[in-house]
Amino acid sequence: MEAPKFVNNACPIPNLNLSRTEEIELDFPPLQIQQKIATILDTFTELSAELSAELSAELSAELSAELSAELSAELSAELSAELSAELSAELSAELSAELSAELSAELSAELRERKKQYAFYRDYLLNQENIRKIYGANIPFETFQVKDICEIRRGRAITKAYIRNNPGENPVYSAATTNDGELGRIKDCDFDGEYITWTTNGYAGVVFYRNGKFNASQDCGVLKVKNKKICTKFLSFLLKIEAPKFVHNLASRPKLSQKVMAEIELSFPPLEIQEKIADILFAFEKLCNDLVEGIPAEIELRKKQLDYYQNFLFNWVQEQKKNSLSTNLN
């Protein structure tokens, strides 16, 4: 208590030297009383040290628990968000791929079955014997060569550059078989009405029914029915079966020339029956084509549904975690 009063603070470093310490005067009670006071002070010092240690331990434990809870909550939230995002992305990719593959497989299988059905009924309905079974045993048939019932023409040279430089609404049909054989669209119109086109080179022998304004490239042959006994649609269905049989495959590129097309012989029932059969087959063909066009749209719709439900479930899980963390902190 007394020593600090004699410290020399005038120096840069405060000090209490030995000579000054020796000069400090102190008052003492009897020895017995000194010993009692010293014992009391020692006890008090020990109790203070114990109390300080206990308080320090308690505060450290509380602080550690609070910090641990906060850090755990933050870390848990961050990890949960990161893992959930990664998991969601992975699941979304996997499920989308699986769904797309499954849908494509299912719809493609259905399409193949429809095409098989169509081919079966087309061949059945165009067979002379079956036509007589359905419409009567005495149904007469007439046989013609294509040149006897049709005007036969060929398309003209139409380049891709010409199509780019002359844009319009009228399709240009070529030797391609995808996209209904359409190469592009221009403002010109070489044909207008009901026609049949066929591919002369490359994928030779593929037949299309046309109705409206269009153009044909030089790799396309064009037929215009001139005989009133013949239904153009019915003729197109007959040629879809018969024309491929006359394709010349010995050359480097398969061909079905105008000359060969002109010589093909076909048999026809009366016009009324031709029209009935053609209407049935045309409706069936349209159904198959609609299914082909509908596959990508169906897959896209299912993907959107999948994304919606994935997002809904992900947000719901996140909300539940937030509520759980809030409850634990409170």
Curated annotation (Swiss-Prot):
Induction: Detected at low levels after 6 but not 96 hours growth (at protein level). It holds the Pfam family Methylase_S. One of its GO terms (molecular function) is DNA binding. One of its GO terms (biological process) is DNA restriction-modification system. Transmembrane segments: none annotated. CDD domains: RMtype1_S_Fco49512ORF2615P-TRD2-CR2_like (cd17255). Contains two DNA recognition domains, each specifying recognition of one of the two defined components of the target sequence. This is Type I restriction enzyme MpnII specificity subunit.
